[in-house]
Amino acid sequence: MTLWYHCSKNTIPKTPVELTMPKKTLQLLDPVLLINAYMQGIFPMADHKGKIHWYAPDPRAILEHDNLHVSRSLRATIRKGIYEVRMDTAFELVMCRCAARKETWINETLITTYRQLYHAGLVHSVEAWRDGALVGGLYGVALRGAFMGESMFSRATDASKVCLVALVEHLKARGYVLHDTQFLTPHLAALGVTEIPRRVYEQRLRAALQLNCTWNEMDT
């Protein structure tokens, strides 16, 4: 079951109802509103008409870092160093590549807003490069001890998976305790993602937000 939350320009009510927001009337999603939504376990997605909806899935998909499944072939790819992994060097390109598919929930309004959050140090990208070209990547929102994965793309074998492994290693090293993947898909399930009830997710989110994790040493 997925709950849809109504959200006005300045508030996020707790009553679950549907909201459709015409793109022409919402050229920019308030970044502060967006962060407040994430802190309540709510996130936005656009439909094919450009309207933004707010989601709070129940159950919620998460990745327990110790449960990440790394296949032998993926381990071999990582060991061979086929891809160069970078962080935060091409955020907007990663997001645009994630959006470049037949059906996408990422529109220009979201790209503009997440760009602002990236410059504020709250959104991050992990990238796989080969021969100077970006061939895979992912991005998400980092809030205290929680990381909310948003999307990933791959244009070469295992490129996005290599990014995920690098992300998990980074999050563990920095002390993050909650890795939210929002929805469960067969692809994510194969990597070790599972579901928990929303009430449990909210408890874990509150606990994660009590921490003071930073993305890198320079943020401390």
Segments and roles (model prediction):
Residues W4-T220:
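N-acyltransferase acceptor-side catalytic subdomain
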